[in-house]
Swiss-Prot record:
It comes from Gallus gallus (Chicken). Pfam families: CITED. Acts as a transcriptional coactivator. Enhances estrogen-dependent transactivation mediated by estrogen receptors. This is Cbp/p300-interacting transactivator 3. GO terms for biological process: response to estrogen. Keywords: Activator, Nucleus, Transcription, Transcription regulation. Disulfide bonds: none annotated. Belongs to the CITED family.
Amino acid sequence: MAEHMMMSMSHGGTGLQSYRMGVSGLQGPPQHGQHVLRTLPAAGQMMPYGGAGMDGAMRPRPNLSGQMSHHQMQNAMMFNGPSQQQQQYMGPVGTQQLMASMHLQKLNTQYQGHPLGMSNGPMGAGAQQYRVGPSQHPGMQHMPSPALTLNVMDTDLIDEEVLTSLVLELGLDRIQELPELFLGQNEFDFISDFVSKQQPSAISC
């Protein structure tokens, strides 16, 4: 029995050797030729795959170091030569600040009669002071204190004139189907409408 196993193993070994010879030399009967053609791409894929795996393991390291040096160069450019970066960064931020200040000036001119309305002087000074250093993002610290306190007071004290002007601007006065805006009035209106609708039906019945 052991001899039979040894013979089968040796036969398998010779089969493997002949199979390897068939792969390397493209020799053998036509049946083995089909197997060779089927396994040849796999064998061809395994060798370059191993080589690519080694190269792939080696390639990211130079790429990573290259990227690191590139980022370090960018950081060095940002920190060593900030004038170019600030000039590039100043263009869109300046236009955005200009548009925002123009919008605020329009809003302020609408409410100039308001006692807490801001004058154009502190806001313009705040916008100019913010535009001087656009790279410093916390602009609330750089704004002057009167404008900041006026903004806080404006947001805290909202009177009915401001609310009615907003309602008129948004056209909410023309919309009658918003009970959450006029909740106190609509409750009584609903009761009176309900009673007035029920009375004619009671009379007709």
